[in-house]
Amino acid sequence: SYGGMVGLAFAALFPGRIDRLAIISAAAEPHAAGTAVRELQRRIVSLGLRNNAANEALSIARGLAMLTYRTSEELARRFAPGIGLEDPLSPSEAGEYLRARGEAFRAVMSPERFLSLSASIDRHRVDAQSIACPALLIGANSDQLVPPAQMQALDASLGGPTSLHLRDCLYGHDMFLKEAKAMGELLQPFLAEGAQ
């Protein structure tokens, strides 16, 4: 994800300082759909800053982000659909989860820092052909932010040998957080090769 973008940028800028590159759920540039969602998030946070509601706006923006990190299938398995009859603002089960994630996020992230981080993702551009070191690429077939086609395009455009692994996963973009064992099984042999 973000670390993958940093790794790609580092490999492109400093080719002599890197021997191997492991990229999880990242591409040479942002996907248009992800950029659109992040732009909405930045507008929400900006509106909050202008109206003395920055923390609530940041929480809402994070909730929106969570919908892009996870799959609709996972949410349908975990939460009941719909809201109560009494109040149009009554939360759904999924909404309560998103609210909790937003509250946790705003405890560790300032609105200004979020705006800078979000914009940096949408400014990310790397000339993948300039990266010649061996690269391991790992992605999820269900990822909405870095769809499989983007991982395949990165695989095809990197200038060195690559190994692409696209996994079926319920967790979408958050695969790397939720499937640590599977990530380790792919990363360990690749990293061990480099240590020899």
Model-derived regions: residue spans:
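Conserved alpha/beta-hydrolase "acid-adjacent" motif
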Residues: Q144-Q150
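Short, conserved loop/helix-junction motifs that constitute active-site signature segments
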Residues: Q129-A132, S157-G159
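Short beta-strand/loop motif that positions the catalytic acidic residue
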Residues: I131, L137-G139, D143
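Catalytic nucleophile serine of serine hydrolases
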Residues: S1
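Alpha/beta-hydrolase-fold enzymes
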Residues: R17-G102
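Active-site nucleophile elbow and catalytic-triad environment of alpha/beta-hydrolase enzymes
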Residues: A100, E112-A128
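Short glycine-enriched nucleophile-adjacent loop
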Residues: G4-P15, L21
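Catalytic active-site module of serine/aspartate enzymes centered on a nucleophile-bearing elbow/loop
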Residues: Q152-D155, P161-Q196
